[in-house]
Curated annotation (Swiss-Prot):
InterPro entries: AAA+_ATPase, ABC_transporter-like_ATP-bd, ABC_transporter-like_CS, P-loop_NTPase, PstB-like. This is Phosphate import ATP-binding protein PstB 2. It is found in: Cell membrane. It is a peripheral membrane protein. GO terms for cellular component: plasma membrane. GO terms for molecular function: ATP binding; ATP hydrolysis activity; ATPase-coupled phosphate ion transmembrane transporter activity. ATP binds at residues 53-60. The gene is pstB2.
Length: 267
């Protein structure tokens, strides 16, 4: 691998009113190991931001910190601020369950519940005691339409979610996440288990979703990052190296390490 100046950085910022989420001096530790090294970063509203970098660079760890998923790891410790709507999501007194209604997550592999398609969508509402069938029906239809799945499943809503294809299951998981009307949707390599056609359909769904949501996606697929995102951030060994409009990252990167990574020269 070529010698790089790892102190070189190029990180764009946005006016505060355009930012859906901001991290300030965010560190993540696994025991004594520092996995994320003091990242300052903003995410623009109603845009898709891709997080890229070689395996082990910290991009998924960073993504998981944004809605406190690292809380489930005993040895994980997160310091710094995660600012959403003027509130520090990383504060100890935050109701994490309520916060995740605003900052949702779609995981790497489709993980539908062992329930019907309908019950997957209504799960959070029914858990909260909502019984209004008309309201629940509307939530199901709206969420499935936004996830581009309604036309395929509208006559099979009470069949098991496991009868769906992998791509359909992933879009069901997106519908389940957006059913509670989050403002931000986190996606951790959502297409990694999908075939090319299902991946294309997922990306088309993302383009529609960004009209209403801010999307942050981790991907190992450079072509996907180039196609599907407005902004791209390059991570390396826990550091944010470069963050810019996607066209700039792929065609005119300011840091040599970024240019070499996206062109396949290392990583």
């Amino acid at each position: 691998m070529a010698e790089y100046n790892w102190d070189e950085r190029h990180i764009i910022t946005f006016p505060e009113e355009n930012s859906a989420l901001t991290t300030k001096d965010l560190h993540v530790y696994y025991g004594e190991k520092e996995a994320i090294k003091g990242i300052d970063m903003q995410f623009e509203k109603n845009k898709i931001t891709a997080l890229i970098g070689p395996s082990g660079c910290g991009k998924s760890t960073y993504l998981r910190s944004l809605n406190r998923m690292n809380d489930t790891i005993d040895i994980a410790r997160v310091t710094g601020q995660i600012m959403y709507e003027g509130i520090d999501v990383n504060a100890q007194d935050i109701n994490v369950y309520e916060m995740r209604k605003h900052i949702g997550m779609v995981f790497q592999r489709p993980n539908p519940f062992a329930k019907s398609i309908y019950k997957n969508i209504t799960f959070a509402y029914e858990r909260a005691g909502v019984k209004d069938k008309k309201f629940l029906d509307e939530v199901v239809e709206t969420s499935l339409k936004q996830a581009a799945l309604w036309d395929q499943v509208k006559d099979d809503l009470h069949k098991s979610a496991f009868t769906l294809s992998g791509g359909q299951q992933q879009r069901l998981c997106i519908a389940r996440a957006i059913a509670v009307k989050p403002e931000i949707l986190l996606m951790d390599e959502p297409a990694s288990a999908l075939d090319p056609i299902a991946t294309m359909q997922l990306e088309e769904t993302m383009f529609e979703l960004k009209k209403n949501y801010t999307i942050i996606i981790v991907t190992h697929n450079m072509q996907q990052a180039a196609r599907a995102s407005d902004y791209t951030a390059f991570f390396y060994l826990g550091d944010l190296i470069e963050y810019d409009k996607t066209n700039n990252i792929f065609q005119n990167a300011k840091c040599q390490s970024t240019s070499d990574y996206v062109s396949g020269r290392f990583g």
